[in-house]
From Swiss-Prot:
Catalyzes the irreversible cleavage of the glycosidic bond in both 5'-methylthioadenosine (MTA) and S-adenosylhomocysteine (SAH/AdoHcy) to adenine and the corresponding thioribose, 5'-methylthioribose and S-ribosylhomocysteine, respectively. Also cleaves 5'-deoxyadenosine, a toxic by-product of radical S-adenosylmethionine (SAM) enzymes, into 5-deoxyribose and adenine. Thus, is required for in vivo function of the radical SAM enzymes biotin synthase and lipoic acid synthase, that are inhibited by 5'-deoxyadenosine accumulation. Pathway: Amino-acid biosynthesis; L-methionine biosynthesis via salvage pathway; S-methyl-5-thio-alpha-D-ribose 1-phosphate from S-methyl-5'-thioadenosine (hydrolase route): step 1/2. Keywords: Amino-acid biosynthesis, Hydrolase, Methionine biosynthesis. Its EC number is 3.2.2.9. It catalyses: S-adenosyl-L-homocysteine + H2O = S-(5-deoxy-D-ribos-5-yl)-L-homocysteine + adenine; S-methyl-5'-thioadenosine + H2O = 5-(methylsulfanyl)-D-ribose + adenine; 5'-deoxyadenosine + H2O = 5-deoxy-D-ribose + adenine. This is 5'-methylthioadenosine/S-adenosylhomocysteine nucleosidase. The gene is mtnN.
């Protein structure tokens, strides 16, 4: 099995990258892909860059160049579920765009023409992630993760997301684009991120302060998930 791992920022991939053995680097299309073994498992780690276009471009290159069997999207997210605090884990059962609107033509809010309203995460990957959460005794929430090309730190933007997606547990800037590409390539995916802020008016300050905490927690989860998947 080869596992693809995608993070947007240097801070979100550096801890994992440093643990990859026999590491080789592919630089292409504004992305960097690091291949090798993580705990003896073949992996391809992508640093995509921030935002939906960067994430989709990188995910496509990763799938074409490295042909992983599954994709794990890692990194940080803004918490929406009331029980979440900094360092907690969110696991996707679905990903949707919060900034797509073609409702004038009868589509659901967040749905693009020719696409499902949401992109479903793979049940087996979700179950494996929840096994790791239980083993590590982490606080976590599973549910809908929404994505858009905006860092959410104001009451108006937050209220709009809560209105359109009251069930959403977290918000970030890449996951749904990655899920969209995985859907097109028919490759299973799951989003496993750690909370860096709670998407409020102080979220930009919280993000800067707690990104390192989120990176450590998401790295811990991904390492355990990789080993869990390799064991089958």
């Amino acid at each position: 099995m080869k596992i693809g791992i995608i993070g947007a920022m240097e801070e979100e991939v550096t801890l994992l990258r440093d643990k990859i053995e026999n590491r080789q680097t592919i630089t292409i299309g504004g992305s960097e892909i690091y291949t090798g073994q993580l705990h003896g498992v073949d992996v391809a780690l992508l640093k995509s860059g921030i935002g939906k276009v960067a994430a989709a471009t990188g995910a496509t290159l990763l799938l074409e160049r490295c042909q992983p069997d599954v994709i794990i999207n890692t990194g940080s997210a803004g918490g929406l579920a009331p029980t979440l605090k900094v360092g907690d884990i969110v696991v996707s059962d679905e990903a949707r765009y919060h900034d797509a609107d073609v409702t004038a033509f009868g589509y659901e809010y967040g749905q693009l023409p020719g696409c499902p309203a949401g992109f479903k995460a793979d049940d087996k990957l979700v179950a494996a992630a929840e096994d790791c959460i239980k083993a590590l005794d982490l606080n976590a929430v599973r549910g809908l993760i929404v994505s858009g090309d905006a860092f959410i730190n104001g009451s108006v933007a937050l209220a709009k997301i809560r209105h359109n997606f009251p069930q959403a547990i977290a918000v970030e800037m890449e996951a749904t684009a990655i899920a969209h590409v995985c859907h097109n390539f028919k490759v299973p995916f799951v989003v496993v991120r750690a909370i860096s802020d709670v998407a409020d008016q102080q979220s930009h300050l919280s993000f800067e302060e707690f990104l390192a905490v989120a990176a450590r927690q998401s790295t811990l989860m991904v390492e355990n998930l990789v080993q869990n998947l390799a064991r089958g």
